[in-house]
C-alpha cells in the first residue's frame, strides 16, 4: 500500500534538487535512487505517471522542453512554510469595548524529539485483561473502571519531580461502555477532530506505509552442540568473568558466551545464576528493568569491604536502585570509611541539588574540586552506595557500570505544604467574600501561546494563555454573560460594593459584560481590576452588577509570570522600554522553566523569519553602545587578533578598543572572584536559551550565551567575545558573579564579524584547503592588521582586507589577494561545506589541526600547503573508504506474545504503520544522544563515503542521530532513516559521520508496528488523522500480538494492541476507536 503523502514528499525532494527540471524518465531514475523503488502511480490509482503528476499542482509544474519532451519542475510558493494562524482577543487598558481580533502568524517552536530532561516513570498503569472475544475484530469498547488502580503519574524514582515526563493530555471521545447503547454521532465528532487537526498541523508525517514488503528470513539460532551440562557452563562462565573482573550486565552474558564458544547460552543457566554463589555474585543495581542485573566473579566477595546487610542485598531494600557494590575494590578498601562525614555529605548534597536532572558520577571529582577547592576522596566513587541516603543512582549505559547518574533526593515537608495551602485557601475565601474561583492551571503543552498584557516589571509580567480552555473558554463565558445580563439587569445591579468583591461590569462602548474585582470604592465611582484582561480602571458605580454564581466556574485568565535572566534588572527603564516595544500586546510563545504560582518563563516571537528571544533582546538593551568595536569605513587597525575562521569564509576578530580593555579588566576580576569563593552558588542549575553565563576558554573564564539545549545536561554555547561555538555539559558553566553582573552585561560582545573583501561568503565556495590555510595563517597571531572596506549595518558585517604585517596600505599584499591568486581558491567539484565552522572543543586550540604550511610574517607569496584532509569527493581519498565494519547492537528485547510493554509512539502514519519506542528506556536514549552531541560537535568535518544501507551518525537540525542510509541524490542530499525514532529525513552529505562502536551498545529503539484487531485496508486520510490524534507523541500500553522477525533490527515488525490508560476510570483500546470510525464511515458512505 503506497502512501500518497510520502510519494509527494519524495517527488518534491527530487525535483528541488534539480534547478533545470527533470524529464519523466529522469524523474523515475532519481526517485528510485532515493527510495529504492519507482514511483508507484498505479498503486495510487492513476493510469499513467503523467496523470499522477498533474494531480500534484502544488508539487510539480509540467511544461515542454526545447526538444518537446515533458519536463517536471518543483513548484515554488509558500505551501512549504507550514505555519499556523493563531487568533486571540485583545483588550487594552484604554478601551473596554468588544475585544478586537489580533491576527498573528506563529511558527511553533519545534518540540524536542523526546523529553530530553526527563526520565520516564517506571511503568504506566496497565489495562485490565480482556479476552480474545472482547478485542477481536475491533468490536469491543473502552473498559469502564471502578476499581482503585495505581496512579499513572507516579514516578518510579520517587523524589525527582523534574525527571518525570510532562503530561500528555488529549481530548478523548466519550466511549459507551456497551455496544448496544451506541448513541455517538461519530461522523460529526470525527469530522470536527479531522478539521481541527488540518488547521493546526497541515504537514503530513513522513513515514513509509507499505507493510507488505518482502523481508529477509530471520537468522537461525545457533544450535547447542551438546545437551545442557551445568558443570561445563559453570567452567565457561568462570572464564568469561575472569575477563570481566569489574562486573558485566547479565543481559550481555549470552552475547559474550556466543562470541567465545560459538554456542548459545542455555536458558536454564540464566535461571540458576543466583544459585551458583561459588561461581558468581548477582546484584540488582537499579529498578529500571528487572532483567538488568550485574554479574561479578565470586572471588571478589572476599576482597570487597564488608558492608551492612542492606547494602549487599539490594533486592530486599526499599530503594534497590540506590544500592551499588564497589566495582573497583582493591586490597586497601578496608581503610575506606563505611559512611560519609557530615561535612562531605552536606557538600555533595548541595552539588546534587544544583542539578535536579541528574549529575554524572564521573564529573563529580572535578566539580567538587572546582567548587570547594579541595579534592574529593577517591573512595566516594569506588563506593557509590555511601551516597544512597542523599541520592538515587542509575546506570543508563548498559556496557559501562561505572557511568552512573546521581539524582538528588528531594524531601518535601508535607505539613508545611498543607498548612501553606490551607492559608492560601483561607485568604482566597476572605478576598472573594466566600465565593471561590478555581485556580488557573498552567497549560501542559511545551510552548503555550500567550498574549502579553502588561510589562511594567519583568518580575511581574501580566499575560493570558491563548487556546482551548483559556482564551476560547473566556470568549464563551463572556458571550453567556452578555446574554444573561441582556435581560432586566436593574434587579442585578450591585448597590453596595466592597473591596475584594467580584462583580460583573458593563463595557462603555458595547454590550459586553466582563468579570472584575472591586479594588477601591469612591463616592460614585469604583476602581476595578478586570480579572480576565489584566488591567485596572475607574468606572461609574452604576455599571456594576452582581456576578451570578455560574460565572465563577472559569479561572481568572489574567496571570503573572517572571522573565528568566532579567531578575536583577526588573525595573531598568531600558529593559522595560524594549519589552514594551517587542512584547506588549503581542501573541508570543512561552517556554516555562518553573511551574510555580508565578512561573519563570522565556518568551519567543516566532512571527518573523527568525525567532526572537524576548528575554535575550531585553538583556541586550542594557549594553553600552559606546563600548562596541569600531566599524568605520577606510579605517585601519593594528594589533588585531583573529579568534575564529568559519568554513564559509566568515572570520571573527578582536580589535583594540575601550570595550575590549574593560572586558579584560572585568574578566580578570572574575578569575580572582572564583579563586576566592568556596560555594556552590555559582553553579548553573537551570540553563535556558539566551542565558548569559561563563565557561572556560583556553583555561580562562569567558562570557558565553546558551544557544541550544540538548536535554538537561548537554547544551550548545557561543563564546560571544571570540565567535567560537562549542557543545559542553552544564556542569562546565558558572553564573556571572553578582558584583560583576552589571559590568559584564553592559559590555557589548567584542567579537567583530568580518569577511574578506573581494571574496564571496557562501556555502561551498571556500575549499577546505583555503579555509585550512587561512586558519593556519592568522589564528593565534595577536598583531594582525585589517582595513575596513565596507560595512553591512543590517548584518553588522565588516568587509575587510586582512594582513599579517603592519603593511596595510597596499591591498595587493593582503591575504585576500593571496587567496584569490592561489590554486587553493580553485573550487573542486562536489565539495560541500557547512555554513558554520565546526564546534570547537574547549580543550583544544580554536584552529583545526595544523598542517605543514608555514608562512613568514611578511605577507610573502603564498605557498601550497600539504593537504591534511582531502576534500569530500576526491578520488584519491583513502579516508573516503567505508569505515570499519560495526558490530551492530543486539535487537531490542520484546516481551512474550500476549504480554504488555509500555511504549511511546514517536511516529504515527495510520493504523497500518506507526513507530514505537520502549517507554522505560527513553532516558537511556537521551543519555546516548547527549554523548553523541559532545563527541561529534568536537570533531572536524571529515570525508565519509556514503553508501546505501550504511549505518552512521547524521546531524538533523541540532541533534545527532543513529541513521540508516536509504538513498543518495546527485546534489549531495542523502535520504536517511532514524533508527531510534522511525523518521525519514533528507540531510546534506556533509552532515554524516562514522558511527563509533561506543554508540552501538544501546539497541536501536524504533519498533515498526501495525495495530492488531483490524482487517487490513487502505486507510483514508481522515482515519489517519484520527489515529494520529489519539496516539502520536503519547505514552501508551502495547500488548504484543505477533512479531515478524527479520535479518536486521530495523526490518522487524510487530503487531500490537494499543491501550490508552491515562484515564483512571477506563481503558481506551485504539482498535475499538478505529473500528467504530470505519463502521460509521461505511454507513454514511
Swiss-Prot record:
GO cellular component annotations of the record: P granule; ribonucleoprotein granule
Domain Tudor: 496-554, 686-743
Stretches that traverse the bilayer: none
Record keywords: Cytoplasm, Differentiation, Repeat, RNA-binding, Spermatogenesis
Localisation per UniProt entry: Cytoplasm
Spans annotated as Disordered: 112-183, 200-228, 297-341, 843-888
Name of the protein in its database record: Tudor domain-containing protein 7B
Upper taxonomic lineage: Eukaryota, Metazoa, Chordata, Craniata, Vertebrata
Gene behind the chain: tdrd7b
Amino acid at each position: 500500500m503506497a502512501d500518497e503523502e510520502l510519494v509527494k514528499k519524495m517527488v518534491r525532494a527530487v525535483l528541488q534538487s534539480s534547478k533545470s527540471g527533470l524529464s519523466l524518465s529522469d524523474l523515475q531514475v532519481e526517485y528510485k535512487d532515493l527510495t529504492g523503488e519507482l514511483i508507484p502511480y498505479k498503486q495510487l490509482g492513476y493510469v499513467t505517471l503523467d496523470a499522477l503528476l498533474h494531480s500534484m499542482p502544488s508539487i510539480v509544474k509540467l511544461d515542454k522542453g526545447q526538444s518537446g519532451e515533458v519536463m517536471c519542475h518543483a513548484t515554488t510558493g509558500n505551501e512549504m512554510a507550514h505555519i499556523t494562524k493563531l487568533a486571540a482577543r485583545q483588550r487594552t487598558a484604554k478601551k473596554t469595548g468588544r475585544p478586537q481580533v489580533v491576527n498573528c502568524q506563529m511558527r511553533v517552536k519545534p518540540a524536542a524529539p523526546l523529553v530530553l530532561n526527563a526520565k520516564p516513570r517506571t511503568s504506566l498503569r496497565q489495562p485490565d485483561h480482556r479476552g480474545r472475544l472482547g478485542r477481536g475484530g475491533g468490536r469491543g469498547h473502552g473498559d469502564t473502571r471502578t476499581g482503585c488502580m495505581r496512579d499513572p503519574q507516579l514516578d518510579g524514582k520517587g523524589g525527582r519531580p523534574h525527571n518525570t515526563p510532562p503530561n500528555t493530555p488529549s481530548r478523548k471521545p466519550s466511549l459507551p461502555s456497551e455496544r448496544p447503547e451506541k448513541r455517538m454521532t461519530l461522523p460529526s465528532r470525527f469530522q470536527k477532530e479531522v478539521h481541527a487537526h488540518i488547521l493546526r498541523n497541515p504537514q503530513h508525517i513522513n513515514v513509509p506505509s507499505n507493510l507488505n514488503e518482502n523481508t529477509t528470513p530471520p537468522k537461525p539460532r545457533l544450535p547447542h552442540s551438546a545437551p545442557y551440562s551445568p558443570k561445563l557452563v559453570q567452567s565457561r562462565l568462570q572464564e568469561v568473568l575472569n575477563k570481566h573482573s569489574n562486573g558485566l550486565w547479565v543481559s550481555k552474558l549470552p552475547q559474550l558466551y556466543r562470541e567465545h564458544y560459538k554456542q548459545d547460552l542455555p536458558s536454564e543457566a540464566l535461571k540458576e545464576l543466583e544459585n551458583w554463589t561459588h561461581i558468581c555474585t548477582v546484584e540488582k543495581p537499579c529498578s529500571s528493568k528487572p532483567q538488568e542485573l550485574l554479574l561479578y566473579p565470586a572471588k571478589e566477595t572476599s576482597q570487597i569491604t564488608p558492608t551492612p546487610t542492606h547494602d549487599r542485598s539490594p533486592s530486599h531494600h526499599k530503594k534497590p536502585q540506590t544500592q551499588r557494590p564497589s566495582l573497583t575494590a582493591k586490597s586497601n578498601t578496608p581503610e575506606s570509611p563505611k559512611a560519609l562525614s557530615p561535612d562531605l555529605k552536606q557538600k555533595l548534597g548541595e552539588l546534587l541539588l544544583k542539578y535536579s536532572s541528574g549529575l554524572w558520577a564521573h564529573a563529580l571529582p572535578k566539580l567538587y574540586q572546582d567548587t570547594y577547592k579541595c579534592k574529593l576522596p577517591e573512595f566516594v566513587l569506588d563506593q557509590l552506595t555511601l551516597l544512597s541516603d542523599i541520592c538515587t543512582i542509575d546506570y543508563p549505559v548498559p556496557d559501562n557500570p561505572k557511568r552512573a547518574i546521581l539524582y538528588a533526593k528531594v524531601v518535601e515537608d508535607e505539613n508545611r505544604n498543607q498548612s501553606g495551602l490551607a492559608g492560601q485557601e483561607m485568604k482566597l475565601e476572605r478576598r472573594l467574600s466566600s465565593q471561590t474561583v478555581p485556580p488557573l492551571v498552567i497549560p501542559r503543552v511545551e510552548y503555550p501561546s500567550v498574549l502579553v498584557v502588561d510589562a511594567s516589571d519583568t518580575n511581574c509580567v501580566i499575560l493570558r494563555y491563548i487556546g482551548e480552555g483559556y482564551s476560547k473558554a473566556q470568549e464563551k463565558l463572556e458571550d453567556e454573560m452578555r446574554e444573561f445580563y441582556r435581560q432586566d439587569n436593574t434587579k442585578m445591579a450591585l448597590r453596595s460594593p466592597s473591596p475584594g468583591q467580584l462583580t460583573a461590569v458593563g463595557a462603555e462602548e458595547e454590550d459586553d459584560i466582563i468579570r472584575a474585582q472591586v479594588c477601591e470604592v469612591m463616592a460614585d465611582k469604583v476602581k476595578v481590576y478586570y480579572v480576565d484582561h489584566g488591567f485596572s480602571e475607574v468606572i461609574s458605580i452604576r455599571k456594576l452588577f452582581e456576578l451570578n454564581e455560574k460565572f465563577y466556574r472559569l479561572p481568572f485568565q489574567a496571570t503573572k509570570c517572571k522573565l528568566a535572566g532579567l531578575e536583577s534588572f526588573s525595573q531598568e527603564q531600558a529593559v522595560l522600554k524594549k519589552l514594551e516595544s517587542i512584547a506588549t500586546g503581542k501573541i508570543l510563545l512561552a517556554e516555562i522553566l518553573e511551574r510555580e504560582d508565578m512561573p519563570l518563563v522565556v518568551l519567543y516571537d516566532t512571527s518573523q523569519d527568525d525567532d526572537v528571544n524576548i528575554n535575550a533582546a531585553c538583556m541586550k538593551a542594557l549594553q553600552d553602545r559606546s563600548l562596541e568595536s569600531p566599524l568605520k569605513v577606510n579605517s585601519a587597525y593594528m594589533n588585531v587578533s583573529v579568534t575564529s575562521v568559519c568554513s564559509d569564509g566568515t572570520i571573527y576578530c578582536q580589535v583594540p578598543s575601550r570595550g575590549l580593555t574593560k572586558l579584560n579588566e572585568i574578566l580578570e576580576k572574575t578569575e580572582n572572584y572564583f579563586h576566592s569563593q568556596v560555594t556552590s552558588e555559582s553553579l548553573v542549575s537551570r540553563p535556558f536559551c539566551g542565558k548569559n553565563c561563563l565557561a572556560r576558554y583556553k583555561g580562562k573564564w569567558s562570557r558565553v550565551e546558551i544557544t541550544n539545549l540538548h536535554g538537561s545536561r548537554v547544551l550548545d554555547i557561543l563564546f560571544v567575545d571570540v565567535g567560537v561555538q562549542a557543545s559542553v555539559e552544564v556542569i562546565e558553566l558558572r553564573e556571572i558573579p553578582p558584583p560583576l553582573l552589571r559590568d559584564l552585561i553592559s559590555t557589548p560582545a567584542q567579537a567583530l564579524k568580518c569577511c574578506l573583501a573581494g571574496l564571496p561568503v557562501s556555502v561551498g565556495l571556500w575549499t577546505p584547503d583555503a579555509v585550512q590555510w587561512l586558519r593556519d595563517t592568522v589564528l593565534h597571531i595577536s598583531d594582525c592588521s585589517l582595513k575596513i572596506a565596507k560595512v553591512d549595518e543590517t548584518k553588522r558585517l565588516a568587509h575587510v582586507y586582512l594582513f599579517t604585517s603592519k603593511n596595510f596600505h597596499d591591498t595587493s599584499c593582503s591575504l585576500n589577494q593571496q587567496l584569490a591568486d592561489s590554486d587553493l581558491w580553485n573550487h573542486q567539484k562536489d565539495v560541500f561545506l557547512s555554513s558554520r565552522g565546526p564546534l570547537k572543543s574547549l580543550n583544544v586550540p580554536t584552529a583545526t589541526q595544523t598542517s605543514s604550511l608555514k608562512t613568514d610574517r611578511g605577507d610573502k607569496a603564498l605557498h601550497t600547503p600539504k593537504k591534511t584532509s582531502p576534500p569530500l569527493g576526491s578520488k584519491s581519498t583513502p579516508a573516503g573508504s567505508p569505515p570499519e565494519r560495526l558490530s551492530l547492537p543486539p535487537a531490542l528485547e520484546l516481551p512474550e506474545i500476549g504480554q504488555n510493554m509500555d511504549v511511546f509512539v514517536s511516529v504515527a502514519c495510520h493504523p497500518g504503520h506507526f513507530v514505537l519506542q520502549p517507554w522505560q528506556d527513553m532516558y537511556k536514549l537521551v543519555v546516548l544522544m547527549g554523548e553523541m552531541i559532545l563527541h561529534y560537535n568536537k570533531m572536524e568535518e571529515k570525508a565519509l563515503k556514503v553508501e546505501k544501507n550504511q549505518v552512521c551518525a547524521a546531524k538533523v537540525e541540532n541533534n545527532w542521530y543513529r541513521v540508516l542510509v536509504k538513498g543518495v541524490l546527485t546534489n549531495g542530499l542523502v535520504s536517511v532513516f532514524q533508527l531510534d525514532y522511525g523518521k525519514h529525513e533528507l540531510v546534506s552529505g556533509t552532515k554524516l559521520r562514522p558511527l563509533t562502536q561506543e554508540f552501538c551498545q544501546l539497541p536501536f529503539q524504533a519498533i515498526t508496528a501495525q495495530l492488531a484487531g483490524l482487517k487490513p485496508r487502505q486507510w483514508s486520510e481522515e482515519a489517519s488523522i484520527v489515529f494520529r490524534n489519539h496516539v502520536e507523541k503519547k505514552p501508551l500500553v502495547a500488548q504484543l500480538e505477533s512479531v515478524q522477525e527479520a535479518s536486521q533490527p530495523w526490518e522487524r515488525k510487530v503487531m500490537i494492541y494499543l491501550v490508552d490508560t491515562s484515564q483512571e476510570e477506563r481503558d481506551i483500546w485504539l482498535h475499538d476507536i478505529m473500528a467504530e470510525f470505519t463502521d460509521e464511515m461505511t454507513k454514511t458512505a
